[in-house]
Amino acid sequence: MSTIEERVKKIVAEQLGVKEDEVTNEKSFVDDLGADSLDTVELVMALEEEFETEIPDEEAEKITTVQAAIDYVNSHKA
């Protein structure tokens, strides 16, 4: 089974239409990977589905980088 980091990066690449090797931990979804506000909402929804968790809006707003997404999932996984 893939690690959480690998799974998050795969989702980010799929949702934002970028190559997986472009998705590194320090990358910002908006500034580095070209996401817009709709992309970030869809990305959060994909993360919720993949990891079977609910991410409240106030928490979702803080998830702006690949590492932030990884950290959130790690700290909230069942």
From Swiss-Prot:
The entry's keywords: Cytoplasm, Fatty acid biosynthesis, Fatty acid metabolism, Lipid biosynthesis, Lipid metabolism, Phosphopantetheine, Phosphoprotein
* Protein modification: 4'-phosphopantetheine is transferred from CoA to a specific serine of apo-ACP by AcpS. This modification is essential for activity because fatty acids are bound in thioester linkage to the sulfhydryl of the prosthetic group.
Residue list for modification O-(pantetheine 4'-phosphoryl)serine: 37
Keyword Phosphoprotein annotated: yes
The chain positions of domain Carrier read 2-77
Q: Which cellular component, as a GO term, is one annotated location?
A: cytosol
The record's InterPro entries line, in alphabetical order, gives: ACP (IPR003231), ACP-like_sf (IPR036736), PP-bd_ACP (IPR009081), Ppantetheine_attach_site (IPR006162)
Q: Which GO terms describe its molecular function?
A: acyl binding; acyl carrier activity
Which GO BP terms, alphabetically? lipid A biosynthetic process
User: Under which pathway is this protein filed?
Assistant: Lipid metabolism; fatty acid biosynthesis
**Which PROSITE patterns did the record assign?**
CARRIER, PHOSPHOPANTETHEINE
Q: Where in the cell is it found?
A: Cytoplasm
One matching Pfam family, short form? Answer: PP-binding
What is the recorded function of this protein according to its Swiss-Prot or TrEMBL entry? Answer: Carrier of the growing fatty acid chain in fatty acid biosynthesis.
Q: Which family does it belong to?
A: Belongs to the acyl carrier protein (ACP) family.
Q: What is this protein called?
A: Acyl carrier protein
Give the source species. Pseudomonas putida (strain GB-1)
Name the gene that codes for it: acpP
